[in-house]
Amino acid sequence: MAEPRKAGDEAAVAGSDSGGLDLTNPRHVRALYLDTLGRTPDGDELELAMSSRPSMLLRLLCGSIGFWQHWYEEQLYYFLLLDNFRPHDPGPGQRLPDLLAAGEISALEAVRATVLSSAFHRANPGNDTFVSVVFEQLLGMTVQREPALLEAGKRMYDGHRASLWGQSGKSQSDVVTITCDQPDFAERFLDREYSRLLGRAPARGELRRWTAELRAAPGDFPQLVIEWLLSPEYSDRLQRLRRKSNRQFLQGLFVDLTHRPPDDETLERCRRALSAVADAGPLRSVIARVLLGGEHIDLPGRDDLPVQDLVVHVFQRFLGRQPGPNELETFITIFEQCECETDTLVRAVTTHWEYQYY
């Protein structure tokens, strides 16, 4: 297992198969789950996915409660509403992911509700900071180039009647509402969501088409995500490894090892620890070792499978691929000479750099 060849935040996949989305390839299934649900599939989900058609699987995933929970966490990260700035939990049935999954609100309405929250106000105090962040994050605007709009927004924030894009208001909620009424709001939202999922900017013509579609049918955001993930551009993305976010790494690690996601308290505690260091890679490996040592992991025993099949099983389960010839030979040799157990192989894989990518 060689060191990665990185380009930005990506690393090349050695020997990956060319072509489109292939659900018989466990790495493709793992990538879909990480992108849509923020975690890897458990064994039953992987088996079901590998016997499904891509469009059928994506209809099952996109728009599910798990999809919206992951999407919402990504929005909180984008707006830096973390830890003490996290929005108040209104309780089951009233959380934004619950309302989104029930079709009671749209993604654009959920973004607006997030920016209207008291948490967003606490995280961005003062008229200059608040208005600048709203314009920049919702519209992609460079406020230094629009001083008149910035000043009008600040007056409106302070309770004085002012006009933005021809609409009048006199409160900070008016600043947000008027900003969300602009056509660039939907376009900026789709631009960043496409880039988040595919790791590249969308074609301008396609972005304009999607924007028009979403403004006409605000509830159709999951259908756009399905279109993106079935596109040749996503298949191309799968030829490159992308680094997992801290949440993706933690949730995927727990599902891979224990077949269940971590509880909220454990997830947030580990996420904060990873976010506190400049390079989270070594600490990610420590968390993997600790989890392996402290949990009952359902793994085939040393004598349950021929050693070659055991090595292949570990690579497919945790990396979604077959081991290369040199990897297979090395792992077999170490396993036989050291008389170790299967968890030693798992530790080697889950603490390696490649496991931190997908």
Predicted regions and their residues:
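Composition-driven recognition of low-complexity segments enriched
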Residues: A2-Y358
